[in-house]
Amino acid sequence: MIILISGSTHTGKTILAQKLLERYNYPYLSIDHLKMGLIRSNNTTLTPYDDDELVPYLWNIVKEIVKTAIENNQNLIIEGCYIPFDWHNDFDNDYLKRIKYCCLIMTKKYIETHFQDILKYASVIEERDEEKLSMEYLITENQKNLSMCKKYGHTYILIDKDYSIDIDIFKRENLK
């Protein structure tokens, strides 16, 4: 099974992937690691700030990794904010039945109430530079992601009152 975890920055994609690794022993790939490897090795002229260009660039690689893992009957978790909302259009039904997708979304209320906690826990798994992160940016991105998930009928986890994700939702029968 392939599990795709998407969401805005700071929603907990990487820590969720780590917890799933520990629970199910599925390896995970952080799209951020792929991005930085390609940038640092000079295999692209894109920078970490070229989000609009990075989505199609990275997705063209990631979707083929997904296909390869499925063809090899391997389990894999892939997490990152560079998964386009129309990702499912790149796979036929034989692939789609082996892919589970979920987007992590924080509500406006959660962000406003817990912004300092979001900053505090930002580096639990990876080191981050938090100087440029604003509450307004997080609210806008999460609202956009919620709208897109609804538009495409994608599964999402809404983080509203407290940050609690039941990882058992990732059992095969619970996600589409």
Regions found by a protein language model. Give the residues of each.
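ATP-binding Walker
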Residues: T11
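A glycine- and Lys/Arg-enriched "phosphate-lid" helix/loop adjacent to the NTP-binding pocket
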Residues: I99-Q143
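Hydrophobic anchor at the beta1->P-loop junction of P-loop NTPases
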Residues: I5
